[in-house]
Design a protein with these regions (language model features):
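Hydrophobic core of transmembrane alpha-helices in multi-pass small-molecule transporters
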Residues: 25, 93, 105-121, 256-257, ...
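Extracytoplasmic gate region of multi-pass secondary transporters
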Residues: 34-38, 243-302, 389
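Intracellular juxtamembrane helix-capping segments at the cytosolic ends
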Residues: 41, 120-134, 354-367
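Helix-to-loop junctions at the C-terminal end of transmembrane segments
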Residues: 66-79, 299-311, 397-398
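C-terminal ends and interior cores of transmembrane alpha-helices
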Residues: 88-101, 321-334
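Cytoplasmic helix-loop-helix junction between adjacent transmembrane helices
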Residues: 110-147
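A late C-terminal transmembrane helix in Major Facilitator Superfamily
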Residues: 144, 153, 353, 366-402, ...
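Helix-loop-helix hairpin linking two adjacent transmembrane segments in secondary transporters
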Residues: 145-198
Length: 452
């Protein structure tokens, strides 16, 4: 009877995926807090927006640079340990901010601690879980987890902004501390490193001879350590191997501008910019939440389009559309909502992470089996661009009293990204077998992506 009851229960992989989703959405939400802290910190401490934005930029850089090495840490120490420590770093960094009195403490807490913590829970975490626990429905799981990581911070914004508005920024920081700590028991109880740790095969896996199946679902400890060293070495050698490749620089340059024009500029400065024009902070944060909703739709649709159209043409269209939107934004900001602003939010949401599927596709065709590692560094350039925009836009606001130059500058750079995208080799020129291999690599290997 016990065996029959167990047979009716969902596979343990779905529990692992659910806990992973909660951790990813939470990590993205934790990274969203600085955008609603800018104004209250400025009011309380008298710090400039450029100074406060420097902490955000450190956070974004570390979030990106952690990605190529996060998989190695998970291989060496296990998923549960790495993610649990990452959540504790977030809780510690957020909790310590309530005692801060100087900007270096803000940079140390929200820049370094939260940046390292959330960076260890980027999409590399999702791809590792999906690759180990799923044979069937793997693509579906990766897609759902990607959406959670990419939109979690935008969905969290209205609630965090309301907390700051009603109870103060310290209360919001403490709520983040408690939330991050609360996820740790879920991770420790719900996640196992391999299906073999609980006597299971991956979801949808066919029965194999015991010895062969053991290697697939639970590699020996020595193999884990060896794979960790190989992963760390591959991350560094992968970068060195493409430094002279024009395709890499075109993709990295375009993704640098992608991060600059999303997470770094709009994600960090839209709320204070809208407040400059008289729009309440909670309302502005709610608009970013709407961006997050349409982000999900745009990402799924872009993946469908990438399978059917030239990825270069898609990127050219996405970046050009984004540039036009940013060029018009200074004319749309006002003290009240109107249809044109809502239209901007919807279109920008559809375009927010739509660049990811065609960028991954072009990485596959240009770099073959090296694509996962190369995309890790392309993603790092995305976060570097976000960091540059976070601090540069704050400096522009402090020097000119307005964000107008930042919007126009980003619009021009988006047009440059469209041009760079047109110079990358076309993924659809790759042979069919190669494309199939590329797809498998993209799913099995950890490919980080922005949480925009």
């Amino acid at each position: 009877m016990a065996g029959g009851w167990r047979g009716r229960l969902p596979h343990r992989a779905w529990l692992v995926a659910a806990v992973t989703f909660v951790a990813l959405v939470g990590a993205a939400g934790f990274r969203a807090v600085p955008s609603v802290f800018i104004l209250p910190l400025q009011d309380e401490f008298g710090w400039s927006r450029a100074t406060i934005s420097s902490a955000v930029s450190v956070n974004l850089v570390l979030y990106g640079l952690t990605a190529p090495f996060a998989a190695a840490l998970m291989e060496r120490f296990g998923i549960r340990r790495v993610v649990s420590v990452a959540l504790l770093l977030v809780a510690t960094g957020s909790g310590l901010t309530v005692f801060m009195t100087s900007t270096w403490q803000l940079i140390a807490c929200w820049g370094v601690l939260v940046g390292l913590g959330t960076g260890s829970m980027a999409l590399v975490f999702a791809a590792t879980v999906a690759g180990r626990w799923f044979e069937r429905r793997r693509g579906l799981v990766v897609g759902v987890l990607t959406a959670g990581g990419a939109t979690g911070q935008l969905i969290f914004l209205p609630g965090l902004a309301a907390l700051v508005d009603r109870y103060g920024w310290r209360t919001a920081a403490l709520v983040v501390t408690v939330a991050a700590a609360a996820v740790v028991p879920l991770v420790l109880v719900g996640i196992r490193d391999y299906p073999g740790d609980v006597g299971l095969r991956p979801y949808g896996a066919r029965p194999e001879p015991d010895g062969a199946q053991l290697a697939a679902v639970r590699p020996p400890d020595g193999a884990r350590e060896a794979s960790a060293a190989a992963a760390a070495g591959a991350a560094v050698s992968g970068l060195l191997g493409v430094l002279r490749d024009r395709a890499f620089w075109a993709l990295a340059g375009g993704f640098f501008i992608c991060g600059l024009s999303t997470n770094g500029l709009v994600g960090t400065h839209f709320v204070p910019a809208a407040h400059d024009h008289g729009l309440p902070e909670v309302t502005a944060a709610s608009l970013l939440a709407v961006v997050g909703v349409f982000d999900i739709v745009g990402t799924v649709a872009s993946g469908w389009l990438t399978d059917r159209f030239d990825s270069r043409h898609l990127l050219v269209m996405y970046y050009a559309l984004r540039g036009c939107g940013l060029a018009g934004l200074p004319l749309l900001l006002s003290s009240r909502l109107h249809p044109s602003m809502i239209a901007f939010v919807v279109v920008y949401g559809l375009d927010w992470v739509a660049t990811v599927p065609p960028t991954i596709s072009l990485c596959r065709s240009a770099f073959g089996e090296r694509a996962p590692v190369v995309f890790g560094w392309v993603f790092a350039s995305h976060q570097l661009g976000a960091a540059v925009a976070a601090i540069a836009a704050g400096w522009v606001r402090g020097a000119t009293g307005t964000y107008t130059a930042a919007w126009y500058g980003a619009a021009f750079l988006c047009l440059l990204a469209a041009f760079l995208s047109a110079t990358v080799p076309d993924s659809r020129s790759t042979s069919t077998p190669g494309r199939r291999r590329g797809r498998r690599i993209a799913v099995d290997a950890p490919l980080p992506a922005p949480g925009t």
